Structure formats: structure tokens, C-alpha cells
Amino acid sequence: MESKCLMFVSIVSVFFMVVNGVSETETLLKFKNSLVIGRANALESWNRRNPPCKWTGVLCDRGFVWGLRLENLELSGSIDIEALMGLNSLRSLSFINNKFKGPFPEFKKLVALKSLYLSNNQFDLEIPKDAFDGMGWLKKLHLEQNNFIGEIPTSLVKSPKLIELRLDGNRFTGQIPEFRHHPNMLNLSNNALAGQIPNSFSTMDPKLFEGNKGLCGKPLDTKCSSPYNHSSEPKSSTKKTSSKFLYIVAAAVAALAASLIIIGVVIFLIRRRKKKQPLLSAEPGPSSLQMRAGIQESERGQGSYHSQNRAAKKMIHTTKLSFLRDDKGKFELQDLLKASAEILGSGCFGASYKTLLSNGSVMVVKRFKHMNSAGIDEFQEHMKRLGRLNHENLLPIVAYYYKKEEKLFVSDFVANGSLAAHLHGHKSLGQPSLDWPTRFNIVKGVGRGLLYLHKNLPSLMAPHGHLKSSNVLLSEKFEPLLMDYGLIPMINEESAQELMVAYKSPEYVKQSRVTKKTDVWGLGVLILEILTGKLLESFSQVDKESEEDLASWVRSSFKGEWTQELFDQEMGKTSNCEAHILNLMRIGLSCCEVDVEKRLDIREAVEKMEDLMKEREQGDDDFYSTYASEADGRSSRGLSSEGINLS
């Protein structure tokens, strides 16, 4: 009986898979019929002989279509939303660099869509105000380099999960609205927007708002004129004017009196407070790290003077920084708290702050909130282990501060920013990306740093555990510096499983285990990201599997030869380096093997990269043509005169 039930379940499962496959096939073919395909044979694979998951530009997960990536195909015609509604798992659409125009399609009918990319098309009409109503899952919207007109849609302003918004290079008019949720990436440059920039955007890069002649206010240098035009106010009689004047004077006197009373009370309370308890804090200004991070140095309850004094002495002991490096000048936590601070970003574990000390040193303070799994003794012992690490491709931890509720890590400030910013952020600002020799040097350095961690932290299954492009900083000479390594023993298990890269690996997703090769998988994904220039999130239907999705996409697209659709054209290639780029892609895919037994170990991966480097040094004079010795020569600067144009 049990075997019959199992057989029935299997038959039903197969039946539904077949029905779904046919349904998605017919749905996509119907969608294809609405397109005008400019590039010959661009969608030739879209036929009934092959399953949809093998079609060009179709992204699948577990046999279901979750994304369409139809870029650079000279497509026009209409985007058949009704057909796309038949794809129940659809989460991502990309039609970048095509020739679509006309009315804005009704994407709001695709309520589960997470990302939409329409950059570099020919849309030239107004977007309806309700164009994004009901799209509560929308995270990323790229509409740059079109000719959209009219105001920014009000429905877009209400999007609860929007983290990326690019509207640059259009003809949007009107004022910038107040967004309900502040996007992490926003570019409104080169439009016809006017009015004052909302205060919530006042600390952003001015370049994100340039090219709008009517905009004023921070972060631009253009000051806004008074919002009131008194000359246009209607004239009133002398009697009414005098009456209004008397009311204004009376109100001003009353307000002044109330202010004086409040100030007096505040001064009284401050003096009373100073007499009753010791003041440990350095009284930082409003832009200090203490004010920005909300760090408190002491608990100021209503106990007696003696109990507060004992607490104060205890806090003096516990607020000392523990230094891991002797080559840095010593400073106290109070020096950090009273220093001017600038928030650099907020990652999955907490915020990072850039601080300028009185001695001129620039440090970064990273605040961790998910480190309650280790007691103070265990925590300090592990920090000493990390402090003993010394490698040119690791960012050292200078000092740390321990408190049960949160921890602070102090490190040197690296002005050149992260690899993620150079790969993805610079594009949004129209700046050149990293060239090929620089990218290869970064990959090689990351591999060496990772190998060092595996040699010196042998007790950890994943010595890094959180390798991704935003955790790779670049020095002035574009040497990679790994950060956020060795954190797994200190991060709460639940938070680690939710947030850390190691727990997104195939072996953990499928078997709930982390292995010695898990970091190698992270290295492989990083190599693919560097070579393709693709954002991992662009491939994510289920966020925790985004890296595996990128590897699957590359594996299905890579045919052993150079293709413009697969490789990032921003890095360029010289006449003799194509084979080396392809070999590095093969190394990356070998690191991304889903089967752990078939995956390279870290030593094998690094050896293959070193062998590739030797080949370059022996036979590729072209390799160094864009690889100057000066720091500015190895920056994001495109091709040399010998480069091949990939456009």
C-alpha cells in the first residue's frame, strides 16, 4: 500500500512538472511574438525543441522561470505583460540596451517582481502616477538613459522595499518627493527636476543630483531662495495691518518669555546633575561618533552618589580599548567618541563610521550587534588570534571594544573604497570601471589572503566565512584587503545562518553543513562577479541562493569562448589576453562546483591562479600595457591604445 502511495505521488509530481513546463513554454513563446527582434537569431533557441530553462536569457530555479535577461538584443515592439503574468515564479526582468518605446508597460500587474531593468531604451512618455501600485516586493528599478517625461510617480515613492533607484538621463520634471523608505542607491542626475532637495538626501554625493538646473539645497552648492514671495501678497487696510502687527508682537513676546523660562529650567537641571554625579563622557559635539552611533559610556540611573561612583569606576575600566597592534599610536575610546564622525554605510551586522582623531589619524569604527554567542574570555582569546594575523592582503584589526550588548572594531581607513563600489557603484556615476589587469591582480591577492587565513586559522571550517565584493577593500595601488574575516565563532548562530555568505553555499543550503571548501565557493562567485560585472542580487529569486544563481547562470552561458553578453565590457581585453580571461573563468567555475568533492580546494585554486600569472609574465607583453606602476595608472581607467573595442 505504501509503495503504491509513493508511486502515485511520483506520478502526480511528474504530471505537474510537465504541465508547468508546457505552460511556461507557451507563455514565453506568446511573449516572444510581441517582440520585434532586431539582432538576427537572437532568440533562436526559443522553440519547443528545448525546455525554457535552456533558452537564451531565461533564468531558472528548480526548473521554474524566475527571470528574463534580454539585454543588448535590439528588441522593440511591445512588452506583453499579460503573457508574463503566466510565469508564476517571475521575479526579475532586464531589457537593458534595447529599443523599446511608447507607453510605460503595466508592470504593476507583476506584483511579485523584485527587480526591473529598462536602462538605455527609448521610452519617451510620462509614467502614470499609479504605475507601481501594489508592487510591494520591488527592490531595484533602473530606468536611466531613456526620455521619460513628467513627474516622478507617487506610487514609486511609497515602495516599501525599494533599495536601488536610477532615473538619471531622462527628462523628469517637478520636485523630488520625500521617499517613504530611503533607497541605498539613488541617481537623479541629468533631468529637469526643480525645487529644494529633501533633507533626507542632503548627505549624498552631489553628482547624483547634477544636471538639474532647477534643483537647490544640500548636497548641491546652490542655495535655495526664500519660499515666500512677499511682493505677491495682497495689500490690506492700514487697520488690519496694524492689528496683525500687534498680534505678532504679542506672540513674539510670549514666545520669548517661554523660551527664557525653559532655558532657565535646563540650566538648573544641568547644574544639579553635575553636582550629583561624575561626568565620564567627553561631551562630544553633535557630529561625534557617540551621537551618531548612540554609544553610551555609563548608565545614569537614579541611585545614590556612592552607587553611581562605583558604576563610574567600573565603566572607566570597561570603556578601555583593547589594542591588537603595537605599530599604531595608542588612543582611548573617549578620543573616538569625541572625534567628528561620518557614516560610511550600514551592512548586515551594523554601521561603519569614519572618524578623524585629534592627532590626524583617520580610523573606521565598525559596530557589531550580533556577537552575543561568545563570552568575554572566549571573545578576547579569539580576537588575539585575529590580531596575530599579518598578511599584505588582510585589513588588520587595530583595536576592539567589548560590551555584552555590542562590540566595536577599529581599523585603518582605506580611502579607495571597496571592490563592489568599483565594479558597480562607479557605473551609476558614469565613471570608468576596473580594467582587466587590475581585476586579475585583485583576484590573485584575494586568493593569497584566503590561503593565508586557511593556513593560520586551521580550527575554523570557514576561516573567512563572509567573502564578498563589499568585504574586499582596495589600497591606493589597488591591492585587495580582505575584511570581516574570522567572524563565525563570534556571530550568533541564527544571525550567521541568515546573513553570512558561507551559509548561502550549496552545501549548506542542501545539507546544512559548512566545509573547508565553502570559502572556495565564495572565491569562485567573486571571480565570476569580477569577470561578468553582474550584481549578485540581479539573479536572486530567493535571496539566500543569489550566489549559486550567478554561478548557474554563468555555467549555462559559458561556451568556452568570449561573448559580449557574458563578460563585462568595461574591463576591456587586449589582443593577447582573451585566453587568460577564459582560463580565469574556468578557475572560477571550478571553485563554484556544487559537488564539494569536485570543487577545488584553496591551495589548488591559488596554484592555478599563480600558474596563470606565470603564463602572463612569460608570454603576454600586452598584459602590462594598461598596468602602470603609479597608483593612478592602475585605477579604473579603461583601455590602452592597444585595446580592442568591445562595443
From Swiss-Prot:
Expression (tissue specificity): Expressed in pollen and/or in flowers, but not in leaves. Expressed in pollen tube.
Q: What class of enzyme is it?
A: transferase
What is catalysed by this protein?
L-seryl-[protein] + ATP = O-phospho-L-seryl-[protein] + ADP + H(+); L-threonyl-[protein] + ATP = O-phospho-L-threonyl-[protein] + ADP + H(+)
The reply on keyword RNA-binding is no
For this UniProt entry, the molecular function terms from Gene Ontology, in alphabetical order, are: ATP binding; protein serine kinase activity; protein serine/threonine kinase activity
Activity regulation details: The phosphorylation activity is calcium-independent.
In terms of Pfam families, this protein maps to: LRR_1 (PF00560), LRRNT_2 (PF08263), Pkinase (PF00069)
Q: Where are the LRR repeats?
A: 87-109, 110-134, 136-159, 161-183, 185-203
Membrane topology category: Single-pass membrane protein
Compositional bias (Polar residues) at which positions?
Answer: 637-647
A single GO CC term for this protein reads: pollen tube
What EC number(s) does its UniProt record assign? 2.7.11.1
Please state the protein's primary subcellular location.
membrane
- Where Phosphotyrosine occurs along the chain? 508
Q: Where are the transmembrane segments?
A: 248-268
Instruction: Spell out the subunit comment.
Output: Part of a complex containing ROPGEF1 and ARAC11/ROP1. The interaction between PRK2, ROPGEF1 and ARAC11/ROP1 is phosphorylation-independent. Interacts with ROPGEF12 (via C-terminus). Interacts with ROPGEF1 (via PRONE domain).
Functional summary from the UniProt entry: Receptor-like kinase involved in the control of pollen germination and pollen tube polar growth. Phosphorylates ROPGEF1 in its C-terminal region, releasing its auto-inhibition, and thereby activating the ROP1 signaling pathway. May act as a scaffolding protein, recruiting ROPGEF12 to the plasma membrane by binding to its C-terminal domain. Phosphorylates ROPGEF12, releasing its auto-inhibition.
Q: Which protein, by its recorded name, is this? A: Pollen receptor-like kinase 2
